[in-house]
Amino acid sequence: METRLRWLLIQAGLPFPEVQANLRDAAARFVGRVDLYYADARLAIEYDGGTHRESMAADNRRQNRLIEAGYRVLRFTASDVLGDPASVVAIVRRAVDP
């Protein structure tokens, strides 16, 4: 589904995002790996698949570290990508090109 999200964005005319990007803080410490990343906008995009409680907790901790390091984070689910792709594109477009 991450691939579908990426292609949705590309087909909508958005730039190609970096895939599985390793992000670092100002001191070059590893903060986390994200599904998609737009460096110019410091925008991380995560696709949330069906997860269990432990991975959700890890995802939340990673998101907090990313935000603390100055990244912006958007999260989408299959329901978003399949049910309302136009909204997904609009949200990302506003974040990439404010």
Model-predicted segments: where are they?
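Surface segments flanking catalytic/ligand-binding clefts of nucleic-acid enzymes
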Residues: 1-98
